[in-house]
Amino acid sequence: CQDMNMKLRFQPVVLSMLFSSMVLVAACSPSKDASNKENASDAQKDLKTAQIKPFPKTADDRHDIDLLIEYDQKFNEMNTALEADLKKMLDEGNLTPELELQRKQDSVRSAQNMLKDLDLKTEQGRYIQGLYYQYWENQAKVYQELKQSTDNELANPTDAIEGMSDYYTAQAQLEHWQQQTAQ
């Protein structure tokens, strides 16, 4: 459980650093200065965790927590395997931008399907599930835009982090719920 708590705290830090650098690049671009400042401000909002919502304790709390943790672990294992596979293909010279994009789109669909398959019994569990799903829905839109782009670039680079607050909020809500249930 301690390993999971550390992972829940570490993952958002890494993601924040990655996406903050994207925001800085977008904000420092010489074109459309006023628009970039607005985009950077919007992006900062997308990186903030919403307040923890209170939910009543139920007999099914442990069940839902375990399912959400299992989902997170399975997704992370799948994502690690995908990254290793992509790296291997890159090293072998077999990775094309189209193939990489397709594999990442497949990963997003898998995350969404895994979430849909969760048999959550509590309001809090379904709330967390919904936050995760909203995040993955946005990622699906980002990859679709990239697929349609002629230069493999997003029209608005900050679109890539839209909805990150949903992901961070889901992680924080789950961690809070775990701590609350452990008491």
What are these model-derived regions, one by one?
Residues 24-27:
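C-terminal motif of bacterial Sec signal peptides marking the signal peptidase cleavage site
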Residues 33-36:
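Ser/Thr/Pro/Gly-rich low-complexity linker/stalk segments immediately outside membranes or between
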Residues 29-31:
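Bacterial signal peptide processing site
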Residues 5-17:
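Bacterial N-terminal signal peptides that target proteins for export
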Residues 98, 105-133, 182-183:
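Short, solvent-exposed, charged loop/turn and helix-capping segments
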Residues 40-102, 135-183:
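C-terminal amphipathic alpha-helix
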